[in-house]
Regions:
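N-terminal export signals
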Residues: 3-4, 10-31
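Alpha-to-beta junction loops
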Residues: 65-67, 83-97
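Extracytoplasmic "Venus flytrap"
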Residues: 37-54, 74-78
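Immediate post-signal peptide segment of exported/extracytoplasmic ligand-binding proteins
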Residues: 24-40, 61-68, 167-169
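Generic structural signal for residues in well-ordered beta-strands
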Residues: 69-71, 149
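Stable alpha-helical elements in mature extracytoplasmic
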Residues: 51, 55, 79-83, 134-137
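Contiguous mixed-secondary-structure segments that line small-molecule binding/active-site clefts
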Residues: 2-3, 88, 98-169
Length: 169
């Protein structure tokens, strides 16, 4: 009978040590992938849509696949000019487009456009946005139009020409 008691004690001791060891080690859980659906305001073959895809690839690679961004071309879910509302309402998780597309909601959003050459060039606009109060103003404007979004500038849009005319103006 002594040997049975000894076996039971050894079993209980081993079990207690194994239990303590199990509790002592952190549980390693594989993180689940978070998937986000973005849409751009550009057709699939447009260079700016490619920029959006490049951004998504960088994020996907940096997170080791834990965050996966899918970028859809314009019109896949909503028309290009409906992108801000779709993101704001949660229909899409994010978007890639031009701020000036929302000019109809507040004319001050035209400041982020690529207007004629007598305005700020792309680098000046980026500098003003980051260091001159532009970001704070954009946040206020989006709040004023009821947009529930967080925005950041991904890159500059080159200045577009004023126009093409048959006769000098």
């Amino acid at each position: 009978m002594t040997s049975n008691a000894s076996v039971r004690r050894k079993f209980m001791t081993t079990g207690a040590v194994a239990g303590a060891a199990t509790l002592g080690f952190p549980a390693i859980v594989k993180a689940q992938t978070t998937s986000l659906r973005f849409q751009s305001t550009w057709p699939a073959k447009d260079i700016f849509h490619e920029y959006a895809n490049d951004f998504a690839k960088k994020v996907n690679d940096m997170t080791g696949g834990e965050l996966k961004i899918e970028v859809l071309p314009a019109g896949s879910v909503v028309p290009a000019f409906g992108l801000l509302d779709a993101v704001s309402k949660g229909t899409l998780d994010g978007g890639h487009g031009v701020v000036v597309y929302h000019y109809g909601k507040n004319s001050a959003l035209a400041l982020w456009g690529s207007g004629p050459a007598f305005g700020m060039d792309a680098n000046m606009l980026l500098s003003w946005h980051k260091y001159g109060g532009g970001k704070a103003l954009l946040d206020k404007l989006y709040t004023a139009v009821g947009a529930n979004v967080y925005s950041y500038v991904y890159g500059p849009m080159p200045t577009q020409p004023l126009g093409w005319f048959k006769k000098p103006i």
